């Protein structure tokens, strides 16, 4: 539904990684709205998982042309899957993780921060982590979901470098990839904080793309507005 506002239909295959980021972002309001009425428990995970499987099944004919891209993502995820089990973690397991588990056990409680300020939520991305905080090694999923987002952002920026006709844009996004790899290579230090930082940097690149590239201006503005809500 959203992709039609942000991409030309014939150009969607060049932005599959970015569309996955849109899915990550849309998980946030979906989880927040649900959390008004229910905790984000394993039932939420299983229901959304079944919906996703059903969507893939009904659109399976369209996925045959995406085999190469899907295979590439599967390989990347398999390579980094051990991080879920061997990563040691740090203070995030005492700072971010308790908030994530709070979302798994309770619906939104208005005014709870007046009882204990540590229960206030300044970062909505905790809701995204709460969606994936299940199954074996659940506490390490705090980092696994962050790493999936991290990989998708790097692949998205690479797509922009590959498809851009502007040298200025290629230079900026190349520098941005190096910055992200150097700055955020230890995701344990950032927990649920780095997603907003990366989106701000990425959106700045979209602003530059608006002025220096020949892409559809309206679609770029729509992307900027969309990502603005998830800083």
Model regions and ranges:
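Active-site lumenal/periplasmic loops and adjacent helix-entry segments of GT-C-fold
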Residues: 80-169, 187-189
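Membrane-interface transmembrane helices that cradle and orient dolichyl/undecaprenyl
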Residues: 163-165, 203-221
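Transmembrane-helix signature of polytopic, membrane-embedded enzymes
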Residues: 11-19, 157-181
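Membrane-interface alpha helices of multi-pass inner-membrane proteins
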Residues: 30-35, 184, 220-231
């Amino acid at each position: 539904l959203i992709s039609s506002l942000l991409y030309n239909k014939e150009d969607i295959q060049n932005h599959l990684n970015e569309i996955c980021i849109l899915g990550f972002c849309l998980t946030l309001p979906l989880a927040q709205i649900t959390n008004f009425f229910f905790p984000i428990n394993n039932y939420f995970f299983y229901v959304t998982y079944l919906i996703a499987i059903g969507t893939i099944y009904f659109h399976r004919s369209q996925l045959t042309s995406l085999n190469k891209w899907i295979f590439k993502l599967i390989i990347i995820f398999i390579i980094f899957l051990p991080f879920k089990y061997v990563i040691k973690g740090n203070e995030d397991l005492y700072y971010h993780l308790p908030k994530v588990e709070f979302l798994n056990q309770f619906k939104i409680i208005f005014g709870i921060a007046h009882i204990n300020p540590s229960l206030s939520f300044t970062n909505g991305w905790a809701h995204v982590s709460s969606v994936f905080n299940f199954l074996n090694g659940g506490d390490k999923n705090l980092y696994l979901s962050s790493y999936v987002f991290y990989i998708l952002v790097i692949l998205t920026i690479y797509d922009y470098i590959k498809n851009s006709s502007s040298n200025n844009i290629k230079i900026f996004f190349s520098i941005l990839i190096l910055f992200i790899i150097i700055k955020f290579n230890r995701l344990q230090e950032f927990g649920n904080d780095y997603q907003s930082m990366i989106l701000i940097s990425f959106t700045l690149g979209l602003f530059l793309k608006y002025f220096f590239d020949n892409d559809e201006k309206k679609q770029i503005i729509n992307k900027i507005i969309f990502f603005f809500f998830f800083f």
